[in-house]
Amino acid sequence: MMKKSYKRKKGPVQSKKITYDGIKFASGLERYMYMALKKAKIKAKYEGQTFELIPSFEFDLESIERQSNGKGEYKNRGNKKILNIKYTPDFIGKDFIIETKGRANESFPLRWKLFKRLLTEKFDPLWTLYKPQNQKECDETIKLILQKQNT
């Protein structure tokens, strides 16, 4: 009897990790953006700053549930510290932030909204946000940044 081979189910977002210039990029689109910024001589740091969207807190109530992955025993998982939620944009420059996003994962839309709220409430209107989703939009982002720098 032949044993069936099963393919492991992958999540909806499959980006390939790529190393370029000694930097490990999470996707080919991030590398493309890096190369475009470098070619245009626009200074930006890759994953240069992490922002805390929601601080950690103590959860002192009971919470009857399984583990967050849906496995494990259905029991009290409350009365513990809840970790903070952080966000690290792909590129950060003097007056811009770029988040390259081919296909958003499940948590990204919420993080992006929380990030926009944080920028609105805690920072001067210093940055312009760009979220290119393909190489054409990366090229357009470069043009827009250069136009802003020349005005």
Residue ranges and their predicted role:
Residues 1-151:
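Electrostatic, structured charged patches in enzyme active sites and in nucleic-acid/phosphate-binding
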